[in-house]
Amino acid sequence: MPVELTGVRVVELGCGLGVPSLVAAARGAELVATDWAADAIDLLHQNAARNGLTLGAKVWDWRTPWEGTFDLALAADVLYEQRNVEPLVHALQQLAPEALIGLAGRPYEQQFLRSVEAVEIAERVVRVRTAGV
C-alpha cells in the first residue's frame, strides 16, 4: 500500500474493528468502512475517535447493491465462512479496480483465489499474508 493515500477513495469490506481502515484514514484516504454488524461499526467509530481520525462507515451486506465505486478495496480475514466467498468476489468486481486482501489461513481462501481467477479479476487483487500465519 502506498504510504500516502490522500485523495484515494478506499472501501474496507468486513471491517470489524477496522485496523486497515484506521491505517488508511491516517494516511489520508477518503474512507468508507463497511461491515454487516452494527456493533462493529460502533466500535470502529470509537477506535477512530480515540485516534483522532474521521472516516465514513456503514452497515452493509455484500449481497446487496452498492452505489458508487472506489479506487481501492481492502479486506482482512474475511474468508472464515464459505458463504462469504462469492459475495466478496462480486463486491470486488463492482467496487474498485484494485484490492488488497489480507489472508489469515482460513479454509476458504483457495476457493476465493480460484473464483477471482475465474472471473478474471485476479490481476486486480493483491494478497497480503503475514509470515507464519
What is the role of each PLM region?
Residues 1-133:
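S-adenosylmethionine-dependent methyltransferases
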